[in-house]
């Protein structure tokens, strides 16, 4: 499991505890599987804090991997490169470049406008994205530690100027919310005018 940051809508420590005790024995046989967790220091601290209160957790079922911005790591055939996000400013929140040797995805969920050091890294590494998935939580409102449609357009144009995308690159918007007062169908019509695709539960994308 790869975590971007420690906000509770992304990191459910209670469910991790369930996975590390006999409650999960049906799907996870003792001494057979280890839960591999990747995250920053804040993610580790949150997990360890809740684990310390649960006497039934078996720590041998978990292996934590500390990840940091701009330091790639691999899980199976996938290469992950963490990038700095603009989100939860009291920790190093992350987004990811994910590559499988054929295609490259920018996973920019839960972030405001990308920091310059992140954009500089993308440009310096000459990364080209086949798919860009962007946070759009703010909708038609001004962005903050989340992006809205304006920031989505600006990021796409910046990536184009950097030659980090191609005419065939697909752009998906995720993490949208009700804060801008629009239902999904209304917002979908708006983003469609900008050439974006709005995600939904169960969406599968083939690259």
Put a short name on every predicted segment.
Residues 1-37, 127-132:
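Active-site metal-binding motif and surrounding structural segment of the metallo-beta-lactamase
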Residues 66-121, 203-207:
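Core dinuclear metal-dependent hydrolase active-site scaffold
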Residues 61-64, 79-81, 191-198:
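Active-site regions of enzymes building and remodeling cell-envelope glycoconjugates
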Residues 33-44, 133, 172-174:
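Short internal beta-strands
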Residues 114-203:
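Cap/insert and terminal regions of metallo-dependent hydrolase folds
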Residues 5, 37, 80, 96, ...:
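Divalent metal-coordination and catalytic microenvironments
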Residues 12-25, 49, 180-189:
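Metal-dependent catalytic neighborhoods of phosphoester/phosphodiester hydrolases
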Residues 20-31, 53-59, 123-127, 157-168:
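Alpha-helix termini
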């Amino acid at each position: 499991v790869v975590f971007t940051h420690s906000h509770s809508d992304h990191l459910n420590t209670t469910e991790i505890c369930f996975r590390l005790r006999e409650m999960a024995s049906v799907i996870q046989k003792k001494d057979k599987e280890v839960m591999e967790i990747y995250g920053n220091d804040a993610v580790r601290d949150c997990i360890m804090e809740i684990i310390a209160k649960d006497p039934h957790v078996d720590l041998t079922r978990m292996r934590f991997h500390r990840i940091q911005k701009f330091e790639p790591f691999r899980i199976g055939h996938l290469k992950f490169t963490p990038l700095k996000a603009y989100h939860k400013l009291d920790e190093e929140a992350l987004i990811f470049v994910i590559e499988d040797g054929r295609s490259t995805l920018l996973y920019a969920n839960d972030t405001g406008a990308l920091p310059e050091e992140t954009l500089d890294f993308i440009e310096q590494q000459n990364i080209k994205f086949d798919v860009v998935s962007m946070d759009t939580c703010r909708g038609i409102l001004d962005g903050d530690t989340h992006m809205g449609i304006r920031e989505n357009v600006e990021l796409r144009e910046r990536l184009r100027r950097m030659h980090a995308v191609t005419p065939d690159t697909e752009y998906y918007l995720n993490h949208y919310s009700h804060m801008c007062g629009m239902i999904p169908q209304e917002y979908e019509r708006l983003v469609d005018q900008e050439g974006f695709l709005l995600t939904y539960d169960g969406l599968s994308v083939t690259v």
